[in-house]
Amino acid sequence: MGVIDMVLFWVLLVNALLIVDASSRNMPFAYQNEMQRHCSSTKYTSLCVQNLREFRHGSLDGLDFVSFLVNKTISDSNLLIPPLSSSMGSSKLVSLEDSTYTLPSPSVSDSCERLMKMSTRRLRQAMEALNGSSRKRHTKHDVQTWLSAAMTFQQACKDSILDSGGSSSASAISHISQKMDHLSRLVSNSLTLVDTIMKNPKPKTKSTALPRWVTAGERRLLVGRARAHVVVAKDGSGDYRTVMEAVTAAHGNGKDLTVIVGDDSATGGTSVPDTATMTVTGDGFIARDIGIKNIAGPRGHQAIALSITSDQSVLYRCSISGYQDTLYAAALRQFYRECDIYGTIDFIFGNAAAVFQSCNIFLRRPHGVKAYNVILANGRTDQRQNTGFALHSCRIRTDSDLSPVKHKYSSYLGRPWRKYSRAIVMESYIDDAIAEGGWAGWLDSGDEVLKTLYFGEFKNYGPKARISKRVTWEGFHSIGFEEANYFSVVKRRNGEDVTNGFKYKFKIKIQI
């Protein structure tokens, strides 16, 4: 760099600092005070202050601060990944500085672009909910859910690039990862402000049979009884003499008869998300009495049966069957009632706010001598995300292939996929196939994660439900009634379950 260039550089730097200092001095004291107060509670305080210094509306409303931060995240997301031209020979991911890095393959680029569009969609939902009259139509839980999902999709984009490994340059991977981390920090700060500023709605005293967002037609679909099409009578007066004859003749009317089947797996070179037999993205998805299988088998490694990124989704009396990574409960609010879920390693994974109520959880025989089973692998990356998994009134048991040899393999309730992983098991039956410690660590994640995770149990029963034998991690909790109620779908009165048949509320602080 020449002398003139050096002098010019320092002149520009000093001017920039003077402008920043002047902008701070020109801010009203009340605004500066509010900005500092709110930002002091965030994880990335300096970034929060830096962003809010750009806010020129002079509002002291904390929600306007949040709205500005969310809008900033949207703007930076759009700068990071513009629409990719399908005619390009190689896909490009554009940085915030407009320099380009070639991604390893079009499939990785397409996946990342899709995830970032999903992230931006949820950011826009949160933005709309924070603006003016919309604030009355949406709750704090809604905004937390959409911001949490936006961060989850950003992390998934980063993961897809990191998993591409040696096919991309180290500099490209590092550069793009840093940009994703920048976006996640912006969302983290927004989540913190939402958590500290917004108020929860007052609980309604009237109990509702189904979530408030389920329509009248959907209620009838879920709780209604089907009209009889055939009659079974031993004396021959009906359509069939035995139940088995009627079942055999049926063309599909239940989770074992109407089944969607796939066999993609990671061993065939397919990316893990793309192995899914069925992928659901539309909000308000409802499934009843249907089966979804991935039959790649235990040698197929990761092979998803069902992947869901649908907000306010409900699955009732469904069967979800696979081995490793069976159910990808990726993001947003999900509820599973009376479902059968089969698998081996991390077979319920993702970062949704998902509750599994009165479900059968079947452990299968894993492949390999040193193989083991893990049910829950939650991917919560920020302590302000309102995500996590809860098993409530479930039965954890072995499938027929594992039962004869279940003591040859270790099986666990869950393990921490991410730093702030959260999982609860309550009022559930725990088979003796589960290890006494109950929970497992994540490979080489270290001791720090054992402090930041949140695993809890409440009033479980069965041969391996003894809390006294559980892991002694700082992040493991034997929770009481109040904490259990916090994670329950159905709230109780005076310790009594107020459920009546298929009735539930879709509102917990993992916030369903």
UniProtKB/Swiss-Prot annotation:
It is found in: Secreted, Cell wall. It comes from the Eukaryota. GO terms for biological process: cell wall modification; pectin catabolic process. Disulfide bonds join 339-359. Glycans are attached at residues 71, 131. The PMEI region may act as an autoinhibitory domain and prevent untimely PME activity during transport. This is Probable pectinesterase/pectinesterase inhibitor 54.
